[in-house]
Amino acid sequence: KINFKNIDIVEHKLNQQKYYSTEFDHLFKRCLNYIPLQKKDIITTYPVKYVIVADSDFQTALQPLIDWKTRKGFVVIEAYTDDPLVGSSNDSIHSFLKDMYDNATASNPAPTYLLIVGDDAQVPSFSGNTGSHLSDMYYCEFDGGGDFYPEMYYGRLSATNIAEVEVQVAKTLTYEKYTFNNTSFLDEIVLVAGVDASMATVYGNGQINYGTDNYFNASHALTVHNYLYGSGTPITSDMTQASAAIISD
């Protein structure tokens, strides 16, 4: 039994309505204190919002994806970096997103998804706290003061030009509409341990070995291409020829 002291029930229910999304339910159900929101019509009354932040050069190339997401029932919000309200810096884009989140209401809930379109030169990422690696997580961290828990699902189509966007949009639509000319590749899996000498031997190899022992194997009618680190496969992930072999597979 979990007891919450001095909780403001009215404020709690209001926050649920402002920030709730049916897309989060599969995560919430794993919590010990999960209580479903008692509004069965919420998905039809307030459809899920899907924000796309992109370089303005990609607007036309993105239209097929925007049309498809709209047909699926999402409310798609387009935000381009040439718009002064959006801006082209990571801070200005974060402020634009945070404003939507902070000003959410029960009748106009916060967005659920963020798709960034463009490479770092087109839509800059943030730098991680523990190194110089790039991270988009901070775009969706609004209310935790750096708690590393994003408030939205986020992803990126890393493209430097229109042609690259068109390819990624076409591939996304092919997957979502299931319009493959040949589906045999769906029975093949490529598993790569990585090239981190301090982690790959234990964690990378460990995850791959666990997966192939229990799930990804011929017993499940799957063809698996493994690239362990250091040893254990004909071509290991740290070999110079690994990149070409992985692409080929």
Give names to the regions the model predicted.
Residues K1-D249:
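Cysteine-dependent hydrolase recognition
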